[in-house]
Every structure is written in C-alpha cells, then in structure tokens.
Amino acid sequence: MLEVEGAEEKGIKVVKVEGEERLCTRNLVDGVQVYGEQLIKIDGVEYRVWDPFRSKLAAAIIKGLKHLPISVSSKVLYLGASTGTTVSHVSDIAYKGVVYAVESAPRVARELIERVAKHRRNVIPIVEDARRYEHYPAMAGKVDVIYCDIAQQDQTDIAIANAKAYLKDKGYLMLIVKTRSIDVTKEPKSIVEEEVAKLRSNGFSIEKVIYLEPFDKDHAMVIARYKS
C-alpha cells in the first residue's frame, strides 16, 4: 500500500486499525480532528486516519504513488481547497512549510477556516476564484508544488496559468483530472491524454499518471514537472 519515498520523515504511515491497514498522517495539532477522522496514538505520537474515498491524494498513494513532491518544508499552492480534508493532510506532511489554500465559495471557505486554518499555523486561506490568480494576496516568493483539484471544464488551463504565475522552475504540478467535468461524451482515458498533451505543450514534463478507481471513478492524478 505504501511506497512513498521518505514516508517516515513526512509522517506518512500505514497502521492496523481493527484488523485493517489504514493510511495515516502524523497529526500537526494533537487532539484536533478535521472531518471526523479517527485519531490513533503510536509510541506517544498521534496520527490521523486518511480516507482515500474522501481524499484523492490518499487514493493516489494507495494506487502506487512513490514520488510525492510535497516535502516537510514545501510551499504548496492548493487550488480547490474545499472544506480542507486533503489540505489538512498536506499540512501534516509539509509541517515546516506553508499551504496557500484557495477556495472560491465563501461559505465553503468559512468551513475551511473554522475546521483547518484556525488550528494550523501553516495553512493560509485565500478566498478567491483560481481563475483570478493575479488577485491572490501577496505570497512570499514562488511555490514548490501546485495541487489542483477543481471541477471546471478549463481546469488544466487554470492550473497552467497559476503555474506560470507562481510555480518555481522545476517545481511540480499535481493535477486532478476530473474527466466528467471536461467532457461527458468522451472516453475518460482520451480526455486524460488530451490534458497531458496540453501540459507538455506548456513546458511540463510528465512524471506519472495514476487512475484513481475504485476510490474516484473517471478521475486521474497527473504529476508534472515545470520546465525541467
């Protein structure tokens, strides 16, 4: 299940819970849950169970993601933060870094702030449409990783525009391709191939494509490196 390089340093672990192997991250804020997840103590260290049916990043790890570009000190721009389920686990991993969490819906952003940002020193919420990236509050320099999980037909174009503005050279884009948001009439695999071609033509090299079934139907994660 767990093949992530540097998993121990990043606080990613597989733990047996009631006889079943479950993916976990070391909790940055002891005793605080984000989405009702189970908290487990191991040798005095608290971990949070990471549900792959609620987090596409967890699904990708279980489906064999080895090179997770997010390090303990990464600066991450997270597009489509929603209420902060995956954001919180990224915050656990990048505990010495920062997560700029972009969410466009004010009501959802309020939940993100209450559930996550209020408790976690390394999460900075940005209430803005990811298309209006030039309106983000000033960020301290460029980011190491952009994680994009937005259900829009032009999701890849939005990710590319944000990368051109904020991603370091040789930085990584982790793009969730939601094929049914792009075109319901085409085969999901052909849509993923089209989005990958779009990334290549904009200066990205593709490291990995992971299809997320059975956790998320018709979704894939693309790991791409910028101007490498």
Regions flagged by a language model, labelled:
Residues 100-155:
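S-adenosyl-L-methionine
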